[in-house]
Amino acid sequence: MGLPWYRVHTVVLNDPGRLLSVHIMHTALVAGWAGSMALYELAVFDPSDPVLDPMWRQGMFVIPFMTRLGITNSWGGWSITGGTITNPGIWSYEGVAGAHIVFSGLCFLAAIWHWVYWDLEIFCDERTGKPSLDLPKIFGIHLFLSGVACFGFGAFHVTGLYGPGIWVSDPCGLTGKVQPVNPAWGVEGFDPFVPGGIASHHIAAGTLGILAGLFHLSVRPPQRLYKGLRMGNIETVLSSSIAAVFFAAFVVAGTMWYGSATTPIELFGPTRYQWDQGYFQQEIYRRVSAGLAENQSLSEAWSKIPEKLAFYDYIGNNPAKGGLFRAGSMDNGDGIAVGWLGHPIFRDKDGRELFVRRMPTFFETFPVVLVDGDGIVRADVPFRRAESKYSVEQVGVTVEFYGGELNGVSYSDPATVKKYARRAQLGEIFELDRATLKSDGVFRSSPRGWFTFGHASFALLFFFGHIWHGARTLFRDVFAGIDPDLDAQVEFGAFQKLGDPTTRRQVV
């Protein structure tokens, strides 16, 4: 046929059987990729430390999505929450991966069958004897079936009525586990961080989909609307489908980047806004203050801070710190976290407590500045020593650790104090193993960042695809050069102005 690469899809334009075939093959490729990717991730995933080396630090992409839907165990005998298990059941990580691969194989065979047996009676219009599809009817069928699936997911899977529930956690991502969720029918269901909204919205949207599907199955579109929206043209279906996909992609890019109940930080890592707003730092200080109010010592109060919470309060876990094109997991960047050294508290020679100003998200380097409780600069690491007034040496800064591995240890040596002041810019201080993976020390983004970038980028491309195909189908006659109102053959010389019937030349 000699089609250019960008026109090859015209071969299925008027061939319903093979149109179905290529869509089944597409499903086979998607399911096959998902299953294969899951097996690859399981082969390289280390489940030994869910606190300091969770899935998102290791760059896992499909494991978090399986986990949020209720999969927590492996046939390898481990659980995502730590510890060992003896009976993971069929729906383990490997079971889900295998199911996708088997499904992919079946779709592959079905696609071949439909490619070979394309000329089926079901695709033949009785009136014309030509292949055709009743697109409004197919729309109704798809709407009804997707509504049933949506309702079933919300009413059974999420609620635990017939299924495991979903991943639910606290606002600080410490106590996450899979559990049934009751639908939230009040105004709280519209809070993106309330898991109950997931159940209620799926039930409501599914019900609407079922009713809308039945409506489109039982009511034919008016002729004027049918013609106006080109409902008989398969490119109309393509255009509106692309619209649905790009809209969904924009929505999930937002829920992933800004955070929601559907994207728990235990599975995808924290958001950049939690670093920008000092979210975990505030929670840590709140807990320490509560401990001091109960007459605990500073050391005791800091020792009770969960290592998991302290680890969230570290800039290396901020998804906006990694460059978009820096390949690899977070562990390949700053290394594998081994342990929390503790919280450093700096004091000057007058005993005044000093706080290191933290690095903002979009800085690669940042001056080391120590301020007191009123925000007044009291010490720094100067760029020019000759002009310094606040250097660590001049101010006599010391550091003492509370909690963590260095609990109770203090340093007054200026070089050591400056080292820990620099590290305190990055949040809580952790010992990082950069040797095992030959980590290069350059921050990487988490799967939260990759997902957002990928979906926002493709949503933009698909938006243009929607405009393109929508214009093609709505203005098909214009692009084809065929005017339905044309009553005379347009030819050179027939009119004084080409195509203008009011300027017809007079025949002498």
From Swiss-Prot:
One of its GO terms (molecular function) is electron transporter, transferring electrons within the cyclic electron transport pathway of photosynthesis activity. Binds multiple chlorophylls. PSII binds additional chlorophylls, carotenoids and specific lipids. SUPFAM superfamilies: Photosystem II antenna protein-like. The chain crosses the membrane at residues 21-36, 101-115, 140-156, 203-218, 237-252, 457-472. GO terms for biological process: photosynthetic electron transport in photosystem II. It is found in: Plastid, Chloroplast thylakoid membrane. The keyword Thylakoid applies. GO terms for cellular component: chloroplast thylakoid membrane; photosystem II. Keywords: Chlorophyll, Chloroplast, Chromophore, Membrane, Photosynthesis, Photosystem II, Plastid, Thylakoid, Transmembrane, Transmembrane helix. InterPro entries: PS_antenna-like, PS_II_antenna-like_sf, PSII_PsbB. It is a multi-pass membrane protein. Belongs to the PsbB/PsbC family. PsbB subfamily. NCBIfam families: PS_II_CP47. PSII is composed of 1 copy each of membrane proteins PsbA, PsbB, PsbC, PsbD, PsbE, PsbF, PsbH, PsbI, PsbJ, PsbK, PsbL, PsbM, PsbT, PsbX, PsbY, PsbZ, Psb30/Ycf12, at least 3 peripheral proteins of the oxygen-evolving complex and a large number of cofactors. It forms dimeric complexes. One of the components of the core complex of photosystem II (PSII). It binds chlorophyll and helps catalyze the primary light-induced photochemical processes of PSII. PSII is a light-driven water:plastoquinone oxidoreductase, using light energy to abstract electrons from H(2)O, generating O(2) and a proton gradient subsequently used for ATP formation. HAMAP family: PSII_PsbB_CP47. This is Photosystem II CP47 reaction center protein.
